Regions:
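Walker A (P-loop) phosphate-binding loop of ABC-type ATPase nucleotide-binding domains
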Residues: 42-46
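Helix-to-loop junction immediately C-terminal to a conserved catalytic motif
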Residues: 55
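Conserved ABC transporter NBD signature motif
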Residues: 63-74, 78-79
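Conserved ABC ATPase "signature" region
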Residues: 103, 107, 115-132
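ABC ATPase C-loop
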Residues: 153-154
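Catalytic Walker B motif of ABC-type/P-loop ATPase nucleotide-binding domains
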Residues: 161-165
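ABC transporter nucleotide-binding domain
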Residues: 179-267
Length: 314
C-alpha cells in the first residue's frame, strides 16, 4: 500500500511564557491508501489541532506534513485539493436538500453531473436516508444532518478522507451503515483518518490506531497489538452475593465498584482458570452472575491516559 499521509515530528504551540501550551508535541504517524486509521484521544488531546494542520488551516511550529507526496505545509492550498473533510461541527446547509448538497460538493470536486447524481443516490440508499433526502436541509434532524455531512465528504473523496466524530447524533442502525460505507471508501483506495474520542466504536472500525494524550502519542499500532502490548489478559465482572466476600487467586487485580459489583483483572493465559473459578463461586453461592472477556481497547486507553496523567502530576 502507498503512503498517503505522512506526519513527521510535528510540533504546534499556542501562547507564550507561562501560558505556552504544546498542542502537538513530536507527532509522527502515517496513513496508507486503503487503510482506516483511528486518531483517538479525549477532549483537548490535540486531535483537532493536528487535523487543522493536515488540511492547511494551521501552520506547524515545526515538522513535516505530506499528503500524496505533496508538502502541504509549504503548499496549504494543495491540502484542500487532496483532502476531503467531515468537520466535527456540521456546516449549515440552507436552501437545498441533502441530495442536492451531496451532488454539488461532488461536482465542485470535479465530478461530472451524471456521475455525481448516481453517487448521491448510492450514498443516500446505503445510509438509509431516502426519507429525508429531498427535504430542505435546514429542516432535517441532527442525525440526518450528520449523515448528509458524511455523504458530502465522501461524494468524490480526495486521496485522504478525514472524518471528525462522524457518528455524532446518528442512530445505532445508521451508524453501522456509515461504518460500512467508510470501509467501502477505503477499499476503493482512499486513506481514511477517523478522529474520535469513542474508543469502543473505533475499535470495531479501524485497521490501526494512534492514541493521543496531551499532544503526545502514547502508542500506535493495530488494535490487537496495542491491547496485547499494554493490556492482555481478561476482565472478569462479577455480581457478589449479599454478605459474601469471595477470595480470588493471587495475582488477580480486584476493583470494587460497590458492595455488589466487582471487576477483576486476570493475567494473560488465565482465561480457563477464571472461568473455572467463576463457575465454582457461583455454585457455592458467592456470586450470582459473572461475565468474562478479553481486556478491551477502551480499558487499555483509560489505563494509559491515567498513568500518563499520574506521571505528569508527579
Amino acid at each position: 500500500m502507498s503512503q498517503t499521509l505522512l506526519v513527521e515530528d510535528l510540533h504546534k504551540r499556542f501562547g507564550s511564557g507561562r501560558r505556552l501550551v504544546w498542542a502537538n508535541d513530536g507527532i509522527t504517524m502515517s496513513v496508507n491508501a486503503g487503510e482506516v486509521v483511528g486518531l483517538l484521544g479525549h477532549n483537548g488531546a490535540g486531535k483537532t489541532t493536528l487535523v487543522n494542520q493536515i488540511v492547511g488551516l494551521y501552520r506547524p511550529y515545526s515538522g513535516r506534513i505530506a499528503v500524496d507526496g505533496v508538502d502541504v505545509v509549504a503548499d496549504p492550498a494543495a491540502a484542500r485539493r487532496l483532502v476531503s473533510v467531515q468537520a466535527q461541527e456540521n456546516v449549515p446547509i440552507t436552501g437545498i436538500s441533502p441530495r442536492k448538497a451531496v451532488e454539488l460538493v461532488g461536482r465542485i470536486r470535479g465530478g461530472r453531473r451524471s456521475a455525481m447524481r448516481q453517487r448521491a443516490k448510492g450514498l443516500i440508499d446505503a445510509l438509509d436516508m431516502g426519507e429525508w433526502a429531498d427535504r430542505p436541509a435546514e429542516k432535517v434532524s441532527g442525525g440526518v444532518a450528520r449523515l448528509s455531512a458524511f455523504a458530502m465528504a465522501v461524494a468524490r473523496p480526495g486521496a485522504l478522507v478525514v472524518l471528525d466524530e462522524p457518528t455524532n447524533d446518528v442512530d445505532p442502525v445508521r451508524r453501522q451503515l456509515l461504518w460500512d460505507e467508510v470501509r467501502r471508501v477505503a477499499d476503493d483506495g482512499a486513506a481514511v483518518l477517523l478522529v474520535t474520542h469513542n474508543v469502543r466504536e473505533a475499535e470495531r472500525a479501524v485497521d490501526s490506531l494512534v492514541l493521543l494524550d496531551h499532544g503526545k502519542i502514547l502508542t500506535k499500532g493495530t488494535t490487537a497489538s496495542v491491547v496485547s502490548e499494554f493490556g492482555g489478559g481478561f476482565r472478569l465482572d462479577v455480581d457478589v452475593a449479599r454478605g459474601a466476600v469471595p477470595a480470588f487467586p493471587d495475582g488477580w487485580g480486584v476493583h470494587r465498584h460497590d458492595a455488589a459489583h466487582w471487576s477483576v483483572s486476570v493475567p494473560e493465559g488465565g482465561g480457563v482458570e477464571a472461568a473455572e473459578w467463576a463457575t465454582h463461586a457461583r455454585a457455592a453461592g458467592q456470586i450470582v452472575r459473572y461475565e468474562l472477556g478479553p481486556v478491551s481497547l477502551e480499558e487499555v486507553y483509560v489505563a494509559l491516559t491515567t498513568e500518563a496523567d499520574g506521571t505528569r502530576a508527579a
